[in-house]
């Protein structure tokens, strides 16, 4: 397959046109007064969005070199969406401004490596100044403002997410499902749960609700399948029946049908209030679930493979809960009697494992396990009039959730592009720097004002006037509120940006811009359709 080549300046200009094309498409969407973009795919209905990452996914340019520039900045936008859920448009705006200004230096003969050094130097100083502006959030109203902003100013999504987090905590597990009709509803519980229920309806104690409900119940956890041939289990059951009249909940890998019948008969005769539950999952996942429940209830996980046989166990292996509610497919524990030190150790372990996890699936499993200890579980049934509206609102809600979690983790900055502009205005560039490094610093600091300028433009304001008015004010949190068209303290009025979102947008824009500016030769496949637009 033949290749096509371009030299440094010609190639950089072509890549810059690709970056600029994507920036033009998403710039008008930034902020509460930003416009929507209509996207129509083959064999599907058109849908409307303001998500920068969603727009970036759909744009392809006919020129192979321009498309290369677009693909690189698109990757930054998609990384932003995956990592922190918000800020993809800001990252694109920053990259466009930074690359375009840096390219001017390359065009007049400045050393690209010095320009890169200057950009990175100013970027590090911006990070330091931004950290000084961080404020912590805690109130439900703060969550509402952040979620609403990250959901493209959808107040309904902001409210439902704030309500969910108020009920299950920031470390709870939230799932999104399609609702019935246009109404969005929330179901949440803070109790510990299992995605598994009773194995037979004969265990039910409350027929009107088809639930098994016991108070002050004992918990037996077995990391093995149980059968009536297992004499050690039968002996343990008899011992429990004779000395412990509390309800017995047995959670095991599996149950032999004959053993299940024996348990049902004992329950129906009133000999022993009992319920059998099959542990969810298989293999290691099942074992980890049982270990979590053991720590929560104070039980000892028994099983031949663990070296802890029922034949050698006393009633001390039983855990306890204040109350348990078992349905056909779910189990809810309340008031587990686990050791507090063991609980804290397991919570620390799970939090550390989440930080170190590199797999999204593993991270989700770990978050669900952590929710058993410190949070709860919530389901949002998202209302919508059409399937496309549901998909778009689901993307907004997922983005808002990531942004809120990011805000809790690292705090917030005054929003509306103000934090970057104010941090840039504080930084003083050392005079003794080489000319290329100094130029790179200036490129970075000037580009940091671009998100604020774009927001002002989208609100119909003079960007120069807005920037000057904001930066002249002594209050570091003073800025322009696009929602009510006023200058005020943005923290007080609830205009936030998660610190990690701004930090990531800065990081990715610097990374992509420096990568492009220090490239000197460009190669693409000639099989890609080519056009020859005039160089600027």
Swiss-Prot record:
E.C. number: 5.6.1.7
Enzyme class per UniProt: isomerase
Key word DNA repair present: no
Organism superkingdom: Bacteria
GO biological process, one term: protein refolding
Keywords: ATP-binding, Chaperone, Cytoplasm, Isomerase, Nucleotide-binding
Signal peptide: none
Cellular compartment(s): Cytoplasm
UniProt: ATP binding residues: 29-32, 50, 416, 497
Molecular function as annotated in GO: ATP binding; ATP-dependent protein folding chaperone; isomerase activity
Parts of the chain that traverse the membrane: none
Pfam families, per the entry: Cpn60_TCP1
Family statement: Belongs to the chaperonin (HSP60) family.
Physiological role: Together with its co-chaperonin GroES, plays an essential role in assisting protein folding. The GroEL-GroES system forms a nano-cage that allows encapsulation of the non-native substrate proteins and provides a physical environment optimized to promote and accelerate protein folding.
Quaternary structure note: Forms a cylinder of 14 subunits composed of two heptameric rings stacked back-to-back. Interacts with the co-chaperonin GroES.
Protein name (record): Chaperonin GroEL 2
Gene coding for it: groEL2
């Amino acid at each position: 397959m033949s290749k096509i080549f371009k030299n440094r300046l010609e190639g950089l200009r072509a890549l810059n046109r690709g970056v600029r094309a994507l920036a033009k498409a998403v710039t008008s969407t930034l902020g509460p007064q930003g416009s929507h973009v209509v996207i129509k795919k083959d064999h599907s209905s058109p849908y409307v969005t303001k998500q920068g990452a969603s727009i970036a996914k759909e744009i392809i340019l006919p020129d192979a070199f321009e498309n290369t520039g677009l693909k690189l900045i698109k990757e930054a936008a998609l990384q932003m969406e995956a990592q922190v859920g918000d800020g993809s448009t800001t990252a694109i705006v920053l990259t466009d401004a930074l690359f375009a200004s840096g390219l001017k230096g390359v065009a007049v003969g400045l050393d690209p490596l010095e320009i890169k050094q200057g950009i990175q130097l100013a970027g590090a100083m911006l990070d330091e100044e931004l950290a000084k502006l961080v404020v912590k959030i805690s109130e439900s109203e703060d969550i509402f403002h952040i979620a609403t902003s990250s959901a493209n100013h959808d107040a309904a999504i902001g409210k439902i997410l704030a309500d969910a987090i108020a009920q299950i905590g920031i470390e709870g597990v939230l799932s999104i499902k399609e609702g019935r009709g246009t109404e969005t509803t929330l179901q949440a519980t803070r109790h510990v749960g299992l995605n598994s229920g009773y194995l037979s309806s004969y265990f039910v104690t409350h027929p009107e609700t088809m639930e098994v409900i016991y108070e002050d119940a004992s918990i037996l956890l077995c990391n093995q399948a149980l059968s009536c041939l297992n004499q050690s289990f039968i002996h343990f059951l008899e011992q429990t029946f004779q000395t412990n009249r509390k309800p017995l909940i047995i959670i095991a890998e599996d149950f032999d049908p004959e053993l299940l019948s024996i348990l049902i008969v004992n329950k129906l005769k009133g000999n022993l209030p009992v319920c059998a539950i099959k542990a969810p999952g298989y293999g290691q996942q099942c074992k980890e679930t049982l270990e979590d429940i053991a720590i929560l209830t104070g039980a000892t996980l028994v099983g031949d493979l663990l070296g802890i046989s029922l034949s050698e166990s006393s009633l001390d292996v039983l855990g306890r809960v204040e109350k348990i509610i078992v349905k056909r497919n779910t189990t809810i524990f309340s008031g587990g009697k686990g050791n507090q030190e063991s609980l804290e150790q397991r919570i620390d372990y799970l939090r550390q494992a989440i930080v170190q996890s590199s797999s999204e699936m593993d991270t989700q499993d770990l978050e669900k396990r952590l929710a058993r200890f410190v949070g709860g579980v919530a389901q949002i049934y998202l209302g919508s009039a059409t399937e496309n509206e549901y998909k778009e609102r689901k993307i907004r809600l997922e983005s808002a959730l990531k942004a809120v979690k990011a805000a809790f983790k690292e705090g917030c900055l005054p929003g509306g592009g103000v934090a970057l502009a104010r941090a840039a205005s504080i930084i003083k560039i050392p005079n003794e720097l080489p000319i290329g490094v100094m130029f790179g610093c200036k490129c970075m600091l000037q580009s940091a004002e671009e998100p604020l300028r774009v927001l002002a433009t989208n609100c119909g304001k003079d960007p120069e006037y807005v920037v000057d008015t904001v930066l002249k004010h002594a209050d570091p949190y003073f800025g322009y509120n696009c929602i009510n068209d006023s200058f005020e303290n943005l923290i007080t009025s609830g205009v936030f940006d998660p610190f990690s979102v701004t930090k990531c947008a800065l990081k990715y824009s610097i990374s992509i811009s420096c990568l492009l500016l220090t490239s000197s030769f460009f190669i693409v496949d000639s099989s890609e359709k080519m056009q020859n637009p005039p160089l600027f």
